[in-house]
C-alpha cells in the first residue's frame, strides 16, 4: 500500500501518502475523538474513541460492530491501547483493567482487580504482545508479563536497579528484533528488559 492510516493531533483518522506526504480523508469518514487504531490479522480495523469504547471496521470503512459499557460487557469506555493475541483483541482501559474481546462470539473477558484481587491495577496504559507473553503497562504498578495461566509483575526496584524498573509508571512498550522489551516511563527514562535474563537496563 502507498498509504498509512494515522490519527492526527486533532484526534481524526486520516490517510498519509508515504511517498508524497499528502494527507487526505480516510475511508472511515469524518470521525472525531479517535485515540488508538489497530489492524488485526483478519484485516479489520479497531478504533478506540475516547470515552466511547471501541469500534470495528472493514477495510472499506464500513462499521462492523461496536463495544461500549452500554451495549456490551466492556468494563470501561476509555480504551488507551489495542493489540491482538491468538485472534483475540486486547484492550488497555483507564480504570477497567484489560478487556479481551473474542470477535467470533463477541464474548469479553475482564482482567482487573475487581475480578481478581491478584491483578495489580485497573488503570492500564499500554500493551505489547511478544511470542507467548502479553506485556501490560499499569499506572503506578509497573509492567505485568502475562503468559497463559501465569503472571509476573515487574515494579520499581530500590536496591538493585537491574532487577526492576527505574519508574513504576510505564507509558509505552515496544519489542525489538532480539525480543527485548523497551519501556518508556513517566519520569524514569527508558528501560530495556531482557526476558532471557530477566534483567533491566536503564537509560
Regions found by a protein language model. Give the residues of each.
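Carboxylate-rich, polar loop motifs that coordinate divalent cations or form catalytic acidic clusters
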Residues: 1-203
Amino acid at each position: 500500500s502507498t498509504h498509512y492510516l494515522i490519527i492526527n493531533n486533532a484526534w481524526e483518522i486520516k490517510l498519509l501518502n508515504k511517498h508524497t506526504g499528502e494527507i487526505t480523508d480516510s475511508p472511515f469518514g469524518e470521525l472525531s475523538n479517535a485515540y488508538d487504531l489497530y489492524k488485526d490479522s483478519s484485516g479489520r480495523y479497531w478504533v478506540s474513541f475516547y470515552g466511547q469504547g471501541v469500534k470495528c471496521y472493514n477495510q472499506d470503512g464500513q462499521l462492523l460492530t461496536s463495544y461500549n459499557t452500554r451495549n456490551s460487557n466492556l468494563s470501561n469506555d476509555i480504551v488507551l491501547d489495542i493489540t491482538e493475541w491468538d485472534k483475540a483483541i486486547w484492550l488497555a482501559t483507564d480504570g477497567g483493567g484489560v478487556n479481551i474481546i473474542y470477535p467470533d462470539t463477541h464474548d469479553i473477558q475482564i482482567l482487573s482487580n475487581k475480578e481478581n484481587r491478584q491483578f495489580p491495577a485497573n488503570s492500564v496504559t499500554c500493551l505489547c504482545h511478544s511470542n507467548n507473553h502479553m506485556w501490560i503497562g499499569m499506572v503506578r504498578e509497573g509492567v505485568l508479563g502475562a503468559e497463559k495461566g501465569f503472571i509476573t509483575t515487574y515494579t520499581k526496584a530500590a536496591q538493585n536497579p537491574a532487577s526492576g524498573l527505574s519508574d513504576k509508571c510505564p507509558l509505552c512498550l515496544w519489542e525489538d528484533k532480539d525480543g527485548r522489551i523497551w519501556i518508556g516511563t513517566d519520569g524514569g527514562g527508558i528501560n530495556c528488559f531482557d526476558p532471557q535474563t530477566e534483567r533491566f537496563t536503564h537509560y
